[in-house]
Amino acid sequence: LSYLFQAAFLLGLTTCIFLVADFYSSDEATLRLLLGFIPWVSLVLVPALAMSAWTDGQADREMELTYSLPISPPAIVMGKFVAGYLLLLLTLAFTLPFAVTVAYLGEPDLGVVVAGYLACALLLGACFAVSLLAAALVREVVGAFVAGIAALFLMMLCGWDVFGRLLRTVLPQWTWETLSAYSPVTWLNQLGEGVIRPQSLVYFGLTVAAALLVTHWVVEQRRRGGLTRLFLGTRLARLVALCLIWLLGIPLAANLPGQIDLTAEKEFSLHAGTKQVLERLPEGTQVTLYWSETGDTIPASIKSHARRIQRLLASMSTRSTLEWNLVNPEPDTEQELQAMARGIHRVPMSSGDHFFLGLTVEQGGRLGRIPYLDIRRESLLEYDVVQAMNGLTRKS
């Protein structure tokens, strides 16, 4: 069955990347498609790998035999996790020809490729740990498979940008930001950009540890004859405490200092002059990025440039009081009129369509702008954005 799982995983991933997303016409030498599809392939296939881990039916007395051996429940849980995780890592290693293909067709950032595979490895570990927990709670094979998919789907959904855009229309921005911090997709994407921050490692570490610990408690109680006692007295208290540690530990980890920037251009490492400008920024400085993110005909190079701009603004906001938001000025909307009224250029394309990619900086009634963030000035991106902010600082 291991070979069948690996074949299904690789076939599903290959189909998504090369047929669904049409990799060869994407004009982009990155692992973005791999990072985009691996959560959804894992959503279905990782629970399939874990669903029979704790079954003990009439035809399969594996667990009964295991319990009769002088092996502690923690060792059993860790053994099953390590065995399954090694299989997942081996399967991930079989995707390396895709990275070789990307390197042959273009010049990918090696640091970003390494970070992307690290992100995939951590994602698979978290998915497998959660799937093992679901299988331990349900035990019946089909039920364990469905429970694993349901648990992973809820976690993936919180980090899905499409769901986020829908949620932002009915709930405040902070609600989506809070929910997305508990999704593995959020941290997969962040690591895949080429930066390793403590919070992403804390998320995956806490998620795997919490899932395996609860799995151990469930297996231990089943070994003693019943699961109901897990939700009584001190056992319930420790379960609640573990949930609180997971819920509070992830957002608190944002305060941990340091990061490892693996990108070749050190996109996440701000220059000393930039840091000085950010320190002088007055309270309430607001940056609004106008970007036509839903445009289907926009070249991949422009989309990649826009993602880099968003990463730069996010990095700046974490190191200062700067606030920023993204506005998508779709045609014939109020957002498009707002962008044009603020001096953001509408850039035409050969297809006849157009797009916006500019920003405004506001503070105390004063307004600075970059009408178009030209990709030809990509190497001066940080300088251009800082100059727009520094203009407000000088005026103050």
Residue ranges and their predicted role:
Residues 30, 49-67, 81:
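Transmembrane helix boundary and interhelical loop/hinge segments in multi-pass membrane proteins
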